[in-house]
Amino acid sequence: MRAPTTVRCSGRIQRARWRGFLPLVLALLMGTSHAQRDSVGRYEPASRDANRLWRPVGNHPAAAAAKVYSLFREPDAPVPGLSPSEWNQPGQGIPGRLAEAEARRPSRAQQLRRVQSPVQTRRSNPRGQQPPAARTAHSVVRLATPQRPAAARRGRLTGRNVCGGQCCPGWTTSNSTNHCIKPVCQPPCQNRGSCSRPQLCICRSGFRGARCEEVIPEEEFDPQNARPVPRRSVEGAPGPHRSSEARGSLVTRIQPLLPPLPPPPSRTLSQTRPLQQHAGLSRTVRRYPATGTNGQLMSNALPSGPGPELRDSSQQAAHMNHLSHPWGLNLTEKIKKIKVVFTPTICKQTCARGRCANTCEKGDTTTLYSQGGHGHDPKSGFRIYFCQIPCLNGGRCIGRDECWCPANSTGKFCHLPVPQPDREPPGRGSQHRALLEGPLKQSTFTLPLSNQLASVNPSLVKVQMQHPPEASVQIHQVARVRGEVDPVPEDNSVETRASHRPHGSSGHSHWASNSIPARAGEAPRPPPVPSRHYGLLGQCYLSTVNGQCANPLGELTSQEDCCGSVGTSWGVTSCAPCPPRPAFPVIENGQLECPQGYKRLNLSHCQDINECLTLGLCKDSECVNTRGSYLCTCRPGLMLDPSRSRCVSDKAVSMKQGLCYRSMVSGTCTLPLVQRITKQICCCSRVGKAWGSKCEHCPLPGTEAFREICPAGHGYAYSSSDIRLSMRKAEEEELASPVREQRQQSSGPPPGAAERQPLRAATATWIEAETLPDKGDSRAIQITTSAPHLPARVPGDATGRPTPSLPGQGIPEGPAEEQVIPSSDVLVTHGPPGFDPCFAGASNICGPGTCVKLPNGYRCVCSPGYQLHPSQDYCTDDNECLRNPCEGRGRCVNSVGSYSCLCYPGYTLATLGDTQECQDVDECEQPGVCSGGRCSNTEGSYHCECDQGYVMVRRGHCQDINECRHPGTCPDGRCVNSPGSYTCLACEEGYIGQSGNCVDMNECLTPGICAHGRCINMEGSFRCSCEPGYELTPDKKGCRDVDECASRASCPTGLCLNTEGSFTCSACQSGYWVNEDGTACEDLDECAFPGVCPTGVCTNTVGSFSCKDCDRGFRPSPLGNSCEDVDECEGPQNSCLGGECKNTDGSYQCLCPQGFQLANGTVCEDVDECVGEEHCAPHGECLNSPGSFFCLCAPGFASAEGGTRCQDVDECATTEPCLGGHCVNTEGSFNCLCETGFQPAPDSGECVDIDECANDTVCGNHGFCDNTDGSFRCLCDQGFETSPSGWECVDVNECELMLAVCGDALCENVEGSFLCLCASDLEEYDAEEGHCRPRVAGAQRIPEVPTEEQAAGLTGMECYAEHNGGPPCSQILGQNSTQAECCSTQGARWGETCDPCPSEDSVEFSELCPSGQGYIPVEGAWTFGQAMYTDADECILFGPALCQNGRCLNTVPGYICLCNPGYHYDAVSRKCQDHNECQDLACENGECVNTEGSFHCFCSPPLILDLSGQRCVNSTSSSEDFPDHDIHMDICWKKVTNDVCSQPLRGHHTTYTECCCQDGEAWSQQCALCPPRSSEVYAQLCNVARIEAEREAGIHFRPGYEYGPGPDDLPETLYGPDGAPFYNYLGPEDTVPEPPFSNTASHLGDNTPILEPPLQPSELQPPAIQNPLASFEGLQAEECGILNGCENGRCVRVREGYTCDCFEGFQLDTALMACVDVNECEDLNGAARLCAHGHCENTEGSYRCHCSPGYVAEPGPPHCAAKE
C-alpha cells in the first residue's frame, strides 16, 4: 500500500469541492452530535421527526469506527461533488471516480487528525471535553455508490433484495439470472476472501481484516501471562501491508490530542501487544491448552490482566486504552434502577393422618425495584439481583455490573482464565457467596430489558431472585425505570457496536466473552454470523422416549445450550431431536460446529458449557463442572443414587438387619416377620410399623426422617448393589488451600510455577541408607520412585510417627503405605546448631518443589515437569520439547512445568496421562464430509471422489449439478433438481409445459365453456361470470339456474314451482288462493260465504276467520272458527258426585253406575249388598266394595261368577297334583291314591316315585339298578341275565344255551362264563379249531414274535371318530389306543398320520380283528401259539369322549349310554344331548324356557306356578294379600347333622337365597343343602367376594356375582393390609372402591381380618346413586321369568312382572331384555375424556387405559401423566 499523496489544487477546484461537500458535512455534524446509536450501526437523529441523514455501509462494526470506507446514498439523493452528467457519464464508472477521489485524498495521518467520530473523541479524552480543534475539524469522506444492476437491463427482477425495480444497495444480480442474490463488497475482498454479505468479507485461514488484507502471524501461548504472543517474523520485518509508517499512524489515531510521537520499534510492539488471530471472520482455529481446568477451548487472543484494561508497554504506555465491552453488549450501563414485575405461587404441604398433600395458591402480582444492582422486600421475603453484563464461563451475577466467577476464570465478565491450581481458595468469593446462602431459594432468569431504545438485539439482563423455598416465581416484565439515569463520565463510555449472536445462541449464551477491541489502525472486527435460531428461546427436554419428549427443564434455553449439554430434544412449540455433534471442533461452510459439552463462543471459539447453571440438574447435591460434562458430588454421609444426580443418605443403603414388626401399640411391638430385613425395606413398604431390637418406630411419610431412609418414597428402597460406594479422599481444594495461604503472605517465586500440578494424596516408604562420604554426620535419604508424576509427600520418622507437615504444603499424613516420590540428588549445607534451612525465612527455598530437611542441610524434591538446577539448590523447568514428544505431527510449545502440542491441520490432540500426542483425524467419520461422493482418509487430510450427478469444486468438495439449468431437460413439464439427479414433474391442472417451465393455459378458448355466462381466464384456472337468473357453481366454473323456491320468501303460503328463470305458486294453504299472475297466494275472505258462524258473528283475518259474540249456551271454539256448546259436566264444579254427568244443550243430568243410587239428585251413593243377605255363605265371607261386593273364599274354594260366590276347587281336574297316583277331590281339598312304586309326599301329599335303587343289595353283585317311575330294572353284567322277576341277575349257563360250543370237549359252566375241558390230560383245547389236540412234547409252544408291522399296530396312539361333516381328524376318542382297540370299536382313523381304519369286509380288518367288531387281543395271553381275544371295554378306552352327561355301561360287544334325566342319547356325537322338554311338555298359561338338563315354566302376574311346576294358575287370593317375596318360600334349617336337618327358623318362611345367605344350612322340606361358604357357588349366590378364589385368580375388574341382593363389592385384593385401596390397580370406575362388607368376614374364619372402610379424600368419594330397584330382592336364575336369568345383572320381580337390575358397566337393552356391555371408550358424555395421553380399550363390563410412551398411569380419574 503506497503512502497517501497530498495533491495541491487550485482555489476554484477546492471551493467547488467544498461547496458540494458543505451541506453533507454540516448535516453530519448536526445529526451525529445528538444522535442515538442503535444496535445495527445506524446514526439517527434524536428527534423522531428529523430525517435520516445517512448510514454507514453494511451492518457490521466497521460502521462504528471513525474510518468510513463508503456511504450508500438514498435512491433520490444527489451525490455531493458530482454533477448528474458526471454521475451517468458513459465510459467512466464509479470505480474510476473513486480512484480519482482517492488520488485527491489527503494523507492518512492528515485524515485521521481531521476526521473523528463522537464516539472515539469521548474514548480518547478522559475528561470528556472535546477541544475546539475537534469540534471545528472538517470531514473528508470517501463516497461509493453501488452500480446499477445489470439484471435491470435484461428484464424484471424477482426474489429478495429488490427495491423499486432494481437491486437494493449492496446487492447485484448473479450470472444469467434476474435475482439479486450476489452481495457487493467495495473495496473487494483480498487474498482470495469471499464476499458473504454486503461489505462483509469471509477471510481464508491465515488472513484477517475488513478486506482480508492482513496476514495473521503465528502465535505461541505464554502460560506466565495467559495470553498469546506473536511469533517473530524473519528478520523482524512486518507482515504484508504493514509498514513502519503505518504503525506510526496507528499511534496517532489512538491519541489524536497529543503531538505526534516517533513510531516504536516493531519488535517491542509485537511483544507487548497481542495480535488478534481471529479478527474478521477468519476460519483459522488454533487450540491451545487452557490454563483453566474446565477444559474450555479458549481463544489464544484473550486479554490478560485482572480487569478490563490493557496497558501498552511501548513508549506510549503512560496513556491508558479503555477496552470496550464485548460484542453484543448494548448501552445499558447507565441504568441505575429497574423494576421486576412477577407473580409468586406459594405451595405448602399439609399432613393429616399419615398422608401429606401439596396445596398451591397463586399470589398477587408484585413489583420490586432494584437500586444499584439489587433490591429487597423485607415483607414478602423476595430479593432480586440483576446484571447488565453477561457473566461468562459459569459466572453468576451478584450485583450491578458485578460477576461472581468460578475458580477457573477471572475478569469483569469471568472471561479470563486463571493459572493452576484449578480449584479456588476457600476464602475466595466468600464475600459474595454469603449473599446466596441462607434459608431463601434462588432462581435465575435471563430476560430482555424492555423500555429501551429500539434495537435489533435488545439488552439481556440476568435477574437472580431469592425467595422462600415454598414459593415459585413467574416474571412478567423487566423494565428500565425512566428518569433514573445518572450521568456517566466520558472515560467510562461504551462504544456501541452492532450486536450479533453466533449460531444457536440465546439469552443464556455468553458468546462474546473473549472479544478484544480492534487494535489501532485496524477496522473493528465484524460480528459473528447470525444463526438460524437467532434470539430464540425454547423448551429443553432431558429425555426422549420413542419420539416423545419428556422431563423438561424448568427454564427456557437456546438450542445450542440445550443440545450441547444435557438435552436430547428442543423446541419452541413442538420438540425435535437434537442434531448429532462432532467429536471435535469443525468448521464447515463458514459455521463452527462444537463437540458435546461445548458451545460456540464466536466463529472460531468453542467454550465449555457450564451444566451446573441448569436448574435441578443435581438434586440435593453439589454440581461440579468438568471439561465437556459435569459431576454431581455429595457431602460426607451422603452418596449418589443410581441416577447419579441425587444424593441419598448412607442410611438408605444400610445393610443392618433386624426384626420388622407389623404392629406397634403403646410402644409395644407385635406381629414380627419371620425373616430379618433392613430398616429401609421394613419402613419404606407399607408392611412395617416398627423395626429393630429397640422397637424403633418407622417415621411417618413426608417427614425428614422418612425421606432420609426412603428417598424414593413408599414402596421403593435402595440396595447396596444399586449404588457404587467410593472412599472420599481429601479434595484438591482442601489440600491446596494451605499452600495458597502461605504464598499469599510471602514474596517467593511467582505463583505460576509451583501451582502447575495439583497436589494429590499419596503415601510413601522411606528407607534409611548408609552414611554419605561427606563431612560431619549428614545422612542421605534414599527415595524409591514408582510413579514419577505424583508430587512429593513428607514422610514420617523411623518409628512410624508422623512428621509434622512442611510449611507451604499442609498435606495430612495417610496410612503407612508405600510412598511414591521422584528421586533427586542431595544438597548438604552447614549451619549453626538447630538451623532449619527449610524454615529459614524463605517461603519455598526449592521453588516448584519440596524442601526436605537433612541433619546437616536440606534437599529439593522437584514437582513433575521440573528438574533440579545444576546448582542443586532449587528446581527449574524441564523442557520436554527437546525430546520431540509431538513426533512431527504438531509443534511442541514448552511451558513452565509442562508442554503442549499444537497439532497441524488434520491431526487432533490426544492426552494420555501427562503426555500429549497428535493423532490423525479421520475426517471421513464426520457427518457431511464429501456429501455426494466417497471420502478417502489420508494422513493428515482426506480427498473426495464424486458420485454421478456431482462435480468437484475448487475446494475439493462435491457439488450437485443442477440439470434444470438446461431448458431441454424437461421440455414437457417442470424440472425439479435433486441431489445428484433431477425429476421431471407434470404441470398442474391449468398449466402446460413449455421449455422446462409450466405456463398458464387459456381455458376460455374452449368452445361451450361457461354456458349462460362469460368466461374470465385466470393464472392456472378460470372462472365464470353468470347472467341474471343464474349463479356460479361451487367450483366457479359453470352457471346454473337460481332456484327461487329454495327460499321461503317465494310463495310462503303455497307450493312454489321453479321454472327456468322464474317460478309459479300453486296449492295455496287453507285461507289463501292464487292471484292472477300466479306468483303469490292471496288471503281468502271466508265471511263472504253463507253458513259460516251460524250461532255467532264472523270476522275475517289474514288466512283465516274467527267467530265471536256467540249465543247463550255457546262459546268460541279453541280455534276460534266456530261456536260450540258449553259442557257443564266439565271442570271441578261437577254436580254429579259418584256418578256420570251427561251434558245436554243448556243443561245436564246425573247417571249413577250399577251398585249406586242417586241421592238429592246430584250425589250417587254406594249400595251395601252384604247387609241383610248372605251372598257368599257358607264357604266364604262377603266383603262390600264401592259399587259391588266380592267373596273372600276359604282354602280349597275359589270365587266364581265374578267373585260373587265361592265354589269348590277341583284340584284333580286343574293341577294334577297326584303324579303317579289317582286324585280324589274332596270338599275344599283332595286326596291322592298312589299306585305301586309310588308313595305320598309328606309335605304336599302328591305321589312321588320310590327309589328302589337306594338299597344297594337290589340286583345283587352282578348287576346295576336303574330306577324308573314306579319301578326299577336290573342291568346285568356280562355272563348274567335278568331273573324272571326282573329284580335280580342270575348266571347264564352257556353250556345249555350254546349247543356244542366246545365241540368234542366237555363244557363246564362257571360264574359269568364257561370252560372247555378235554377228556385227557395229554390234550389241550384249541379255541380256533374248536376241538382237542395233543399237547406239544416237552414244553408249551413259544408265542411267535410279532412282526415290525404288527408291533407298530400295538403302539398306543390317537384314535379319531367320524368327522360328521367337520375336518377328518378333529374328534379324538382316545390318546393311547392300539390300532385294534381303535378300529374294532368306535374309531374311524388312527395313528400319527390319521390313517383310516379298514372296512369290516376287508382282508386288513380280518387280520387286524380276527374275532370281529368289539373284540381286542389280550395282551400277553397266548394259547397254542395264537392270541386270545376279549371284549373291548369302550367305557374304559374312551371314557371321557363317550356318554357325556350320562353313564357308560359296557356290553358284549359294544356299550350303551344311560343318560341323566333331561338328556337323550345322540348316536352321531356319542353323547347325551339336552332334551328340549318345551317341545313335548305344555307349560300351560306360561312360558317354557329350556335349560341344560331341565326346563322352567315362568308365569305372568297374577298367575303363579302350581306345585307340579308345569302349569300357571290363578292365585286363590287377591294380589294384595301376597307380596312379591312370598313366592317359593319354605322352611330354613339352621343346622344339618349327618344329612339330617334340624333347628328350623321359627316365625316365618324364607326363600332359598335368603336362607343360605344368612344363618341357614339347608332349605325346604327336601332339606336342600346350602353351598359351602368358601365355594364359588356361595359367592355367586350371596353376592359376596370369595377371598381365596380372588387371591388365586389375581385382581379382577368385577366381582363374580350373578344374582341376589347386596352392594357392589370389589375383591379383597384391591385393598392393602390397612384397608386402604391400592390406587395403582384402580379400575375405570373413576372412584375409589369401597372395601367389602365387614360382616362377610365372619364366614371366612377367625383369622380373616375384618376390613374397615378407609378414610377417603372428599374429592374421590363417588356420589350417592339412588337405585330404584335396590329394595327388591334378587331372584335365582330358575326363579326368574326372563330368558337366561338376567346375565350380567340380577333378576328382580316387580309388580309389573320381572326386570333386570344390571351391574355397573352394563345397561339394560329393553328390546332384548338383557344387560349389555357399556362401551365407556365411546361415551363422550363424561366430565373428562377417558385415558388422556393414552388410548382406551373396552372390556366386558369395564375398560382399560394403555398409556402412550413417556406417560404413566395416575391415581384418581383415569388419565396418563408425563413420566418424571
From Swiss-Prot:
Residue positions of the PTM Phosphoserine?
S493
Kindly name one Pfam family recorded for this protein.
EGF
In this chain, composition skew of type Pro residues spans 257-266
What's an example GO BP annotation here?
Answer: transforming growth factor beta receptor signaling pathway
Gene3D superfamilies associated with the record: Laminin, TGF-beta binding (TB) domain
InterPro entries, alphabetized: ECM_structural_protein, EGF-like_Ca-bd_dom, EGF-like_CS, EGF-like_dom, EGF-type_Asp/Asn_hydroxyl_site, EGF_Ca-bd_CS, Growth_fac_rcpt_cys_sf, NOTCH1_EGF-like
Tissue expression summary: Expressed in cortical astrocytes and glioma cells. Expression is up-regulated by TGFB1.
The record's region (Heparin-binding) falls at 94-115, 226-243
Consult the record and explain the modifications the protein receives after translation: N-Glycosylated. Contains hydroxylated asparagine residues.
Subcellular location, record wording: Secreted, Extracellular space, Extracellular matrix
Which residues of this UniProt protein bind heparin? L331, T332, E333, K334, I335, K336, K337, I338, K339, V340, V341
Q: Which SMART domains match?
A: EGF, EGF_CA
Superkingdom is: Eukaryota
Question: For this UniProt entry, which residues form the secretion signal?
Answer: 1-35
Segments of this protein annotated with the region Disordered: 80-140, 220-279, 484-529, 729-759, 786-809
Keywords for this protein: Disulfide bond, EGF-like domain, Extracellular matrix, Glycoprotein, Growth factor binding, Heparin-binding, Hydroxylation, Phosphoprotein, Repeat, Secreted, Signal
Q: List the disulfide bonds.
A: C185-C195, C189-C201, C203-C212, C387-C397, C391-C403, C405-C414, C540-C562, C549-C575, C563-C578, C612-C623, C618-C632, C634-C647, C660-C682, C669-C695, C683-C698, C684-C710, C838-C851, C846-C860, C862-C875, C881-C892, C886-C901, C903-C918, C924-C935, C930-C944, C946-C958, C964-C975, C970-C984, C987-C998, C1004-C1015, C1010-C1024, C1026-C1039, C1045-C1056, C1051-C1065, C1068-C1081, C1087-C1098, C1093-C1107, C1110-C1123, C1129-C1141, C1136-C1150, C1152-C1164, C1170-C1182, C1176-C1191, C1193-C1206, C1212-C1223, C1218-C1232, C1234-C1247, C1253-C1265, C1259-C1274, C1276-C1289, C1295-C1307, C1302-C1316, C1318-C1332, C1359-C1382, C1369-C1394, C1383-C1397, C1435-C1448, C1443-C1457, C1459-C1472, C1478-C1488, C1483-C1497, C1499-C1512, C1532-C1555, C1541-C1567, C1556-C1570, C1557-C1582, C1680-C1691, C1686-C1700, C1702-C1715, C1721-C1736, C1731-C1745, C1747-C1760
Please state the protein's primary subcellular location: secreted
Which PANTHER family is this protein grouped with? Answer: EGF-LIKE DOMAIN-CONTAINING PROTEIN
**Family affiliation:** Belongs to the LTBP family.
Stated name of the protein: Latent-transforming growth factor beta-binding protein 2
